[in-house]
């Protein structure tokens, strides 16, 4: 199912993350702090519950969910969001909605790395993590 995602992932690189955060409406100071953070991501599965834990010097977050079921998440920048994550062709697709807005976060394993693509409107950011 999602076994290829399980493990701890160490931040490797980031493209266009500040522009993506700006598109989300994240304030200047928070963008600057988040932009220099190098988070580790740990993904685990217990039965049919998937947990994604993100830890950095900026903020720690943790979310647990079942594929296809809506869940609430308070993001690292304090947005209160409604989310659904599905698995499509080996890609974890997360649709995140709040205040009439929507962003899509796609997680996939490519060449042994975790690649996270975040898109809102026409702005896309790509963050890459390697196995720790």
UniProtKB/Swiss-Prot annotation:
Name a GO CC annotation attached to this entry. nucleus
Keyword Cytoplasm included in the entry's annotation: yes
Q: Where in the cell is it found?
A: Cytoplasm; Nucleus
InterPro entries found in the cross-reference section: Calycin, Fatty_acid-bd, ILBP, Lipocln_cytosolic_FA-bd_dom
Question: PROSITE patterns annotated for this entry?
Answer: FABP (PS00214)
Q: Which domain of life is it from?
A: Eukaryota
> Where is the short sequence motif Nuclear localization signal located?
22-32
According to its UniProt entry, the function of this protein is described as: Lipid transport protein in adipocytes. Binds both long chain fatty acids and retinoic acid. Delivers long-chain fatty acids and retinoic acid to their cognate receptors in the nucleus. Has the highest binding affinity for linoleic acid and decreasing relative affinity for eicosapentaenoic acid (EPA), alpha-linolenic acid (ALA), docosahexaenoic acid (DHA), oleic acid, palmitic acid and stearic acid, respectively.
Which family is this protein grouped under? Answer: Belongs to the calycin superfamily. Fatty-acid binding protein (FABP) family.
Protein name, per record? Fatty acid-binding protein, adipocyte
Q: What is the lineage of its organism?
A: Eukaryota, Metazoa, Chordata, Craniata, Vertebrata
């Amino acid at each position: 199912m999602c076994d290829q995602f399980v493990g701890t992932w160490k931040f490797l690189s980031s493209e266009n993350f500040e522009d993506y955060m700006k598109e989300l409406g994240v304030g200047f100071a928070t963008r600057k702090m988040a932009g220099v953070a190098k988070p580790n991501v740990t993904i685990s599965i217990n039965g049919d519950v998937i947990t994604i834990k993100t830890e950095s010097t900026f903020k720690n977050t943790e979310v647990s969910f079942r594929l296809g079921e809506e869940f609430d998440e308070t993001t690292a920048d304090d947005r209160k969001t409604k989310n659904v994550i599905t698995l499509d062709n080996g890609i974890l697709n997360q649709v995140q909605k709040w205040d009439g807005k929507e962003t899509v976060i796609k997680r996939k394993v490519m060449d042994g790395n975790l690649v996270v693509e975040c898109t809102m409107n026409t702005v896309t950011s790509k963050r890459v993590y390697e196995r720790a």
